[in-house]
């Protein structure tokens, strides 16, 4: 059996309504994406910590609908547009999609990822290419962080070079737990992972169990008092700026902090906020993203 994939690019104000209308009219599945993804105009859609995002679609959105082969895309789209009060049917493209073993196809798209000098991130259906390396077994899932994104890679490279056995580490915005797990495998103890998303916390716990990594996870209100040798936060620039005082206060005097989720063009602005508390600069850049790293000044 084959399917049809309908792709429509349109303004934010119509994206969610159109996706709902397409589902009501018989689409098998519909997703809304950033039409500017992987470009300088990409817009992350995350709320500030503890807040709901102020928008639910991107300024330039792409609606992707999977249709049964007997559905006529143009007719369906015209009906959906009429349903939401759009007089003119938006421009669209259609391609045929053959039925496949979707599990096998998805798995084939995720190969082991080498990072740094001795790290491999390995999906569960693959064998580790180098059994003597630092192996993190991690499957793509709901929580952010599998090593494929430049910001995750940057933070992992920094941790590999920075963590010393016995140091305490706080991973704030832990997502899948990948950075916390790596810190533990590098010898850190204790390691704490914090995230605002309960689903991410649960995913991180499961990933740590799979990797035999003793990491404590929780929501922000469970973040322990006290200071850490290392604090790492791979989030986004706005939350990083809002939480600068809190994150810096979690670093021991003389301890180190690494920040990512920051585009190169945002680096100076983020660094300026943290400069009140730590000596910080761009540690490394990769594919337009940066990792900022610094040391908390000693108390006097």
UniProtKB/Swiss-Prot annotation:
Binding-site list for S-adenosyl-L-methionine: 152, 173, 195, 234
Any one GO cellular component localisation term in the record: cytosol
Keyword terms of this UniProt record: Cytoplasm, Methyltransferase, S-adenosyl-L-methionine, Transferase
Record flagged with keyword Transferase: yes
Catalytic activity reported: L-lysyl-[protein] + 3 S-adenosyl-L-methionine = N(6),N(6),N(6)-trimethyl-L-lysyl-[protein] + 3 S-adenosyl-L-homocysteine + 3 H(+)
Subcellular location: Cytoplasm
BP GO terms, sorted: methylation
Gene3D superfamilies attached to this UniProt entry: Vaccinia Virus protein VP39
Superkingdom to which the source organism belongs: Bacteria
Enzyme Commission code(s) on record: 2.1.1.-
Recorded family membership: Belongs to the methyltransferase superfamily. PrmA family.
Record protein name field: Ribosomal protein L11 methyltransferase
Naturally occurring in which organism (per UniProt): Burkholderia lata (strain ATCC 17760 / DSM 23089 / LMG 22485 / NCIMB 9086 / R18194 / 383)
Name of encoding gene: prmA
């Amino acid at each position: 059996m084959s399917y049809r994939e309908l792709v429509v690019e349109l303004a934010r104000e119509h994206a969610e309504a159109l996706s709902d209308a397409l589902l009501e009219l018989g689409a098998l599945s519909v997703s809304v994406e950033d039409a500017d993804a992987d470009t300088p105009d990409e817009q992350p859609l995350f709320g500030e910590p503890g807040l709901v995002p102020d928008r639910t679609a991107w300024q330039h959105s792409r609606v992707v609908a999977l249709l049964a082969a007997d559905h006529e895309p143009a007719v369906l789209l015209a009906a959906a547009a009429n349903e939401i009060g759009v007089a003119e049917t938006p421009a669209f493209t259609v391609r045929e999609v053959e039925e496949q073993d979707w599990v096998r196809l998805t798995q084939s798209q995720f190969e082991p990822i080498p990072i740094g000098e001795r790290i491999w991130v390995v999906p569960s259906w693959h064998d580790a290419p180098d059994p003597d390396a630092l192996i993190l077994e991690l499957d793509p899932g709901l929580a952010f962080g599998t090593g494929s994104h430049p910001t995750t890679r940057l933070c992992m490279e920094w941790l590999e070079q920075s963590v010393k056995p016995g140091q305490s580490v706080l991973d704030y915005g832990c997502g899948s737990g990948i950075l916390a797990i790596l810190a533990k495998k590098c010898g850190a103890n204790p390691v704490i992972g914090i995230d605002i998303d309960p689903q991410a916390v649960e995913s991180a716990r499961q990933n740590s169990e799979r990797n035999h990594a003793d990491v404590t996870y929780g929501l922000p209100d469970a973040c322990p008092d006290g200071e850490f040798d290392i604090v790492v936060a791979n989030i986004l620039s706005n939350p990083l700026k809002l939480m600068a005082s809190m994150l810096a206060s979690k670093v021991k005097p003389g301890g180190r902090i690494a920040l990512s989720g920051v585009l190169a063009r945002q680096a100076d602005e983020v660094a300026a906020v943290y400069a009140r508390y730590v000596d910080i600069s761009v540690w490394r850049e990769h594919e337009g993203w940066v990792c900022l790293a610094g040391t908390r000044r000693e108390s006097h």
